Amino acid sequence: MKRKYILKKNWEFQKIIDSKKQFIFPTIILYYKKSDSFQIGISIPKKFAIAVKRNYLKRQIKSILDQIRPYNLSYEMILIVRKNYLNLNFLQKQQEIKKIIERISNGKEKIK
């Protein structure tokens, strides 16, 4: 995943979270905001795993996003991983992220 697609700064994360548009899944919370271009930030809480494992999970998510190629979406997004995500295998993780990206690309705002 190219650097231009990645959000890193705290104020960038806060701006998107303050928009209060979100999808909540058992394994992932996705905050999003309409934008001119696609950008994504990935957050994994410190209490879930040591730094090596958190970085490994971030690399996995970036790899999955590279396979899906959602770069034509005009959204800024924050993916926050939940504890259940750690127990999934790679294929299940891939399906979860695909499901989320499809939801946002179809424009389904309400999720219950």
From Swiss-Prot:
Keyword Iron-sulfur found: no
Gene3D superfamilies: 3.30.230.10
One GO cellular component, as annotated: ribonuclease P complex
Enzyme class: hydrolase
Reactions accelerated catalytically: Endonucleolytic cleavage of RNA, removing 5'-extranucleotides from tRNA precursor
A GO BP annotation: tRNA 5'-leader removal
Stored Pfam families: Ribonuclease_P
GO molecular function: 3'-tRNA processing endoribonuclease activity; ribonuclease P activity; tRNA binding
Family according to the record: Belongs to the RnpA family.
Function as written in the Swiss-Prot or TrEMBL entry: RNaseP catalyzes the removal of the 5'-leader sequence from pre-tRNA to produce the mature 5'-terminus. It can also cleave other RNA substrates such as 4.5S RNA. The protein component plays an auxiliary but essential role in vivo by binding to the 5'-leader sequence and broadening the substrate specificity of the ribozyme.
Protein name: Ribonuclease P protein component
UniProt source species: Mycoplasma mobile (strain ATCC 43663 / 163K / NCTC 11711)
Gene: rnpA
